[in-house]
């Protein structure tokens, strides 16, 4: 439960920090086709942060091993990258940099999933929706960047 709370808290903090900047995405920017309504994002992210936390908890509860430690470090790294992406995209509106940052996050996610798989298969499977959403987010980020230059 602690891992779920940690994940949700990071997401909530990022949301709180950029709350005054999110309006630009909703109103002032040209968004790419398939952009979901704004209400979808907090719902999806709440579920994804819960899945992240459940996966991390399963890893944490696994027997100590170098793979477990690596998995937890990767979890922390991707959570950090996830947090800062919101700040880069919404607060600074640095859409190109945000896309590069998101590509790095995507790589970390893929690496984390592979690391999780070596420790707990279910923990790894719980991260696939996150990777898929990050892929969709990259499409949206790219679209916003290209359409609003």
Please state what every model-predicted region is.
Residues 1-17:
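N-terminal signal-anchor transmembrane alpha helix
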Residues 20-34, 148:
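Membrane-interface helix termini and inter-helical loops of multi-pass transporters
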Residues 36-51, 92-105:
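Membrane-interface loop-to-helix entry segments
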Residues 50-86:
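Helix-adjacent hinge/juxtasegments
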Residues 75-85, 99-112, 130-134:
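Hydrophobic alpha-helical segments of small multi-pass membrane proteins
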Residues 85-97, 145-149:
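Membrane-interface helix caps and helix-loop-helix hairpins in membrane proteins
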Residues 114-132:
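Interfacial loop-to-transmembrane junctions
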Residues 126-145:
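Final/C-terminal transmembrane alpha-helix of multipass membrane proteins
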């Amino acid at each position: 439960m602690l891992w779920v709370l940690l994940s949700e808290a990071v997401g909530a903090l990022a949301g709180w920090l950029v709350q005054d900047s999110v309006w630009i995405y909703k109103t002032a920017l040209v968004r790419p086709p398939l952009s979901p309504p704004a209400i979808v994002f907090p719902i999806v992210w709440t579920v994804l942060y819960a899945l992240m936390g459940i996966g991390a908890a399963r890893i944490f509860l696994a027997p100590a091993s170098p793979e477990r430690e690596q998995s937890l470090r990767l979890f922390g790294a991707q959570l950090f990258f996830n947090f800062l992406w919101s700040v880069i995209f919404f607060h600074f509106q640095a859409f190109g940099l945000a896309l590069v940052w998101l590509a790095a996050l995507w790589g970390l996610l893929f690496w984390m999933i592979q690391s999780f798989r070596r420790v707990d298969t279910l923990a790894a499977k719980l991260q696939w929706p996150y990777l898929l959403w990050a892929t969709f987010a990259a499409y949206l980020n790219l679209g916003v960047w290209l359409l609003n230059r």
